[in-house]
Structure formats: C-alpha cells, structure tokens
C-alpha cells in the first residue's frame, strides 16, 4: 500500500540523496531550505531555472531505474531512442511522484526536435485556444492559468514542460474532455451527450464513443474497490489496485463488489462510461493532431491508470488511428526501490521505478 509521506522525512532523504548530485553552482551558504519550496512541497523548478541548475543534476540512479516490461535494465538513452521511434508515447504517472515530474521534463528535452508535440491530460479540449494563445505570447501567464483552469499543482509539476514547449515553439495538446461533460455522463449516462449542441460536441470524441473493454472494466472495478476500502487518496488507490487484483477477481466472480461499493450496476456503468470518456477524448485529441500532422509524434502525459497494461487511451487510439506505433511508459513509485517486482511485469512497454520514500510533489 502506498503510504502518505510526511515532511519530517525531508532533511534526511535529501541530505543523503539529492544534495550530493546538485551542481557545483550551489554555494556553501545555500542549504536545503534555500532549494526546497515549502509552498509546492518539492524542489521548486522556478528556483532551479533561476539559478541555472541543470535538471538532470537532481536526477541520478539514486532516484529511478528503467526496465523493459519483463524487468531487464535499460538506460536513459535506450528510453529516449524508443520515444523518438514511436508515433505516440504515453508517460503514465502517479500525480504526486516528484521524480516522475522531473523525468517528464528531462525526457521532453532529450527527445525534442521540430516534429515533437506535447499532449497533457491536465488541460481540457475547450481551453485549447487559451493554451495556444499563451504559447504564442499573446496572453500573460496569470490569464493563462486562470482561463486555462490549470491544476493546483501546475507550478510545481507541469509548468516546466509548458515553458519548454513555449521556448521551442512546440505544439501542446489540451487533450482531456471538459470536466462538466465527464460529470454529466457519471450522473445521466453517456446517452445524455447526444443532447448537447453541435458546438459542445466539438470538444468531445465522435459520439457514441467506443465502450470500455472487459479488461478495462475489470481494472476499473478493482480501482473502485480499493478506493472504497482505503479512502480518497487517488495516487494510493491507483497503485494499490495492482497488488489487490487477485482479490478483486474473486469478488467479481462472487458478485460482492457492487455491495462493497454501495453502487448498483447502473450507477457503476455510468461511472465507468465517464472514466472511459476521459480516455476516448485524450485518444481522439492525439489521433486528430496526427491526422493533420502525420510527420509529428506525440509525448502524452497522463495518470498511469489511463494507459497501464495498454488499456484505456492506447485501446482508443488503436481504434482511431490503427496504424500508429505506441510506446507505453509506466512510472511506478515503490518502497522496494530500486527493485523490479513481479507485479510490475507488463504494466508498460517500459517501466520506470522511482523512490517512493521521497516527499510527494504536492
């Protein structure tokens, strides 16, 4: 089970792991508190940029290991080569994983060329024009964050990717479905989307969107069961579901799961349809971009549930763009770091194991 990480670990962990890796530009008078930004709960990327510290200096093998789907070790260069050879790469993260966020920026920088496009779960399709306006320098960052409905952890976890994209003139896809329509489906069912105006439907994949596969439905039931059992920390729920999958299969067979969740089957199916709309929307955004720009490739950042085991977004993308080549990268924080466990096999084409003992990013 993923545990909540407390601030009291901060000094011990960072003194032993991070500080020796920091570039020599740090002076003796600059201690951990100078670098650590308490308002974000991690090493502030704005501090790193302002002081000219190379991002990779904070990332060593003391923080992550890279493996193929079977647990064979890979290098960072191996990973970048795989990214540049794929039409679409999914970077599946736990949203509080500080190492994942730094790796995402690093991989974006290392894989960058004129054909690279960034795609983010964290922005919704109806604010694509706002993202474009900010990247073009037309609006201020303050207005971008407000009008773009940025996540609360934007500054600490995603800003560096947007700023790099802005600097390089790289397209950024606001790929997720608007939350109001996700909520609509969870309450009223997916058929309710058909009543929307033609203007509203522009922000959604073609309707009706494909139903979730049975494997995806089983995985979602596992998540819902874990969520009900352990409480509302979603990053904990996502990872715990992998270790509890055998127990969930038994409960599915015995018909116990709906009773535990307090949901009837109709309510569960509507929640599943809402979750599935997220995945279909992100896949449709990526497919639409590549149909218009077939020379491009896409690096897409999403919560790992949306792409683990090649389920979710990859399934929909295969439907919308059958000939595309896809690479699934799952980033897994683990308390058994740096070991690759049997439970991680097949989670992604590439699995990056990170140190779960580090403080969360937010």
Where are these regions (language model features)?
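Bacterial N-terminal signal peptides
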Residues: 9-17
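N- or domain-start disorder-to-order transition segments that initiate the globular core
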Residues: 24-86
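C-terminal regions of proteins
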Residues: 42-53, 162, 276-277, 281-299, ...
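Acidic/histidine-rich, surface-exposed loop or edge segments in extracytoplasmic proteins
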Residues: 61-63, 84-92, 139-146, 268
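Solvent-exposed loop/turn segments at secondary-structure junctions
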Residues: 94-97, 123-127, 178-182, 304-307, ...
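Active-site-adjacent structural elements in enzyme catalytic domains
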Residues: 96-127, 153-167
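A substrate-binding/cap region within the structured catalytic cores of diverse enzymes
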Residues: 129-285, 289
């Amino acid at each position: 089970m993923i545990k909540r990480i407390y601030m009291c670990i901060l000094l011990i962990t960072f003194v032993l792991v991070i500080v020796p890796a920091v570039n020599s530009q740090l002076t003796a008078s600059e201690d951990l508190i100078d670098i650590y930004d308490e308002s974000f709960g991690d090493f502030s990327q704005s501090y790193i940029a302002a002081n000219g510290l190379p991002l990779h200096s904070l990332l060593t093998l003391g923080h992550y290991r890279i493996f193929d789907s079977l647990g064979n070790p890979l290098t960072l260069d191996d990973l970048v080569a795989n990214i540049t050879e794929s039409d679409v790469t999914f970077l599946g993260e736990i949203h509080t994983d500080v190492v994942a966020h730094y790796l995402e920026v690093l991989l974006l920088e290392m894989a960058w060329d004129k054909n690279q496009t960034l795609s983010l779960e964290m922005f919704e399709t109806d604010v694509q024009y706002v993202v474009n306006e900010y990247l073009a320098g037309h609006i201020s960052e303050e207005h971008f964050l407000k009008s773009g409905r940025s996540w609360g952890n934007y500054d600490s976890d995603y800003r560096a990717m947007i700023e790099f994209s802005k600097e390089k003139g790289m397209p950024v896809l606001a790929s997720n479905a608007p939350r109001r329509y996700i909520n609509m489906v969870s309450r009223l069912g997916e058929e309710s989307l058909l009543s929307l105006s033609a203007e509203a439907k522009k922000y959604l994949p073609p309707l009706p969107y494909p139903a979730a596969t049975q494997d995806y439905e089983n995985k979602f039931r596992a998540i819902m069961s874990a969520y009900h059992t352990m409480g509302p920390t979603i990053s904990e729920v996502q990872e715990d579901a992998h270790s509890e999958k055998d127990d969930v299969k038994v409960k599915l067979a015995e018909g116990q799961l709906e009773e535990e969740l307090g949901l009837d089957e109709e309510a569960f199916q509507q929640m599943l349809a809402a979750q599935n709309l997220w995945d279909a929307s992100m896949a449709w955004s990526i497919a639409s971009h590549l149909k218009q720009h077939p020379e491009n490739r896409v690096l897409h950042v999403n919560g790992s549930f949306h792409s683990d085991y090649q389920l979710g977004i990859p399934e929909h993308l295969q439907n919308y763009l059958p000939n595309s080549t896809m690479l699934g990268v799952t980033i897994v924080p683990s308390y058994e770091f740096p070991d690759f466990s049997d439970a991680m096999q097949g989670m992604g084409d590439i699995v990056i194991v990170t140190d779960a003992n580090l403080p969360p990013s937010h």
